[in-house]
């Protein structure tokens, strides 16, 4: 195997710290043609679908990829903007904000980039760019507050896979979750309070998280527990009683049982229980995307109103809100503690290297 090196390395170049923010992914366009390879990459990941590969290959290529891309493209067209995918646009804004904060706090020593686990910009491509920019230390922050094997775990797999190809490995720190970090909890609570100041409160606050098959929980994935802890801490920050909020799970597909209660079924039954006004927030999503804008903001709104509800409000994700960007910056600063204590003088390093016979 030929390992990737840095043939243009210069001793006079000051080493830099890389910060990689990642999210799930997005197709390149809201078209059937673009959705097919994106969904194929996403759904073929064994972290996402834990089914024996031969069986799943037949289902994926024989059924799903011949039907789902068209439906997904129609949904993506509803949320696409002038900047393209909302998830990618928000990631770009988050990267810009974190980069500005780190530079302001610690100087121009950082290479901050964003990447997607599926689609583009791909993790491997972005890491190559970062190594070319001279990073020798790397912090990876998957933008999933709650750890899940299909999300955070898969991100680690992809980063690790890329690093196995490299001759010079960086010092590496990987943030696996921040579901109970007070700065993140505070940012979510502030966002909800701001919504209440403008619109008042509803009968119930629904905290909807992306779902996953129930057997992942029984086999040891901590995602379900971390979601409930996040909800509890948000409720405490807002001073809510347990009866004033509900934790639910959305976006299930297939016939297997997923984490419950399901968001759509909960919204469908609440009016019969006398709950006619709800506000929905998605604390497991760091940025608005198809699952929040279309599924929660549109589809589930219709479900609730058609079931007899009278008021439905979706509270947007944190996206690039300043409090959120500050929380992300602080998480990263915690991880680089110690990396900034011993700055190298590139001039001295270059001189010493030349004395040992390094190329001029």
Residue spans of the language-model regions?
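Active-site-proximal alpha-helix that buttresses catalytic centers in soluble enzyme cores
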Residues: 1-360
């Amino acid at each position: 195997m030929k390992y990737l090196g840095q043939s243009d390395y210069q001793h006079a170049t000051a080493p830099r710290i890389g910060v990689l923010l990642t999210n799930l992914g997005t197709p390149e366009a809201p078209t059937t043609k673009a959705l097919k390879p994106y969904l194929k990459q996403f759904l073929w990941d064994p972290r996402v679908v834990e089914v024996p590969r031969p069986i799943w290959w037949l289902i994926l290529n024989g059924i799903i990829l011949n039907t789902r891309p068209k439906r997904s493209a129609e949904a993506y067209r509803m949320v696409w903007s002038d900047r393209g995918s909302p998830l990618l646009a928000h990631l770009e804004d988050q990267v810009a904000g974190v980069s500005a904060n780190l530079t302001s706090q610690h100087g121009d020593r950082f290479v901050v980039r964003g990447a997607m686990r599926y689609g583009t910009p791909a993790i491997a491509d972005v890491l190559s760019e970062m190594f070319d920019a001279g990073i020798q230390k790397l912090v990876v922050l998957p933008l999933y507050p709650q750890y899940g094997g299909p999300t955070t775990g898969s991100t680690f797999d992809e980063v690790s896979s890329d690093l196995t190809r490299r001759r010079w490995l960086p010092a590496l720190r990987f943030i696996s979750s921040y579901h109970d970090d007070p700065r993140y909890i505070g940012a979510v609570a502030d966002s909800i309070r701001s919504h209440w100041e403008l619109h008042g409160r509803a009968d119930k606050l629904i905290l909807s998280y992306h779902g996953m098959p129930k057997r992942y929980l029984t086999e040891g994935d901590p995602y379900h527990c971390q979601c409930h802890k996040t909800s509890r801490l948000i409720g405490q920050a807002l001073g809510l009683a347990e009866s004033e909020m509900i934790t639910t799970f959305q976006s299930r597909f297939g016939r297997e049982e997923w984490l419950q209660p399901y968001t759509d079924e909960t919204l469908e039954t609440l009016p019969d229980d006398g709950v006619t006004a709800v506000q929905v927030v998605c604390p497991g999503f760091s940025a608005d995307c198809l699952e929040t804008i279309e599924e929660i903001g549109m589809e589930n709104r219709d479900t609730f109103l058609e079931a007899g509800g009278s008021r439905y409000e979706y509270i947007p994700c944190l996206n690039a809100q300043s409090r959120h960007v500050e929380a992300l910056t602080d998480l990263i600063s915690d991880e680089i503690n110690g990396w900034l204590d011993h700055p190298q003088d590139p001039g001295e390093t270059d001189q010493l290297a030349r004395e040992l016979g390094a190329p001029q």
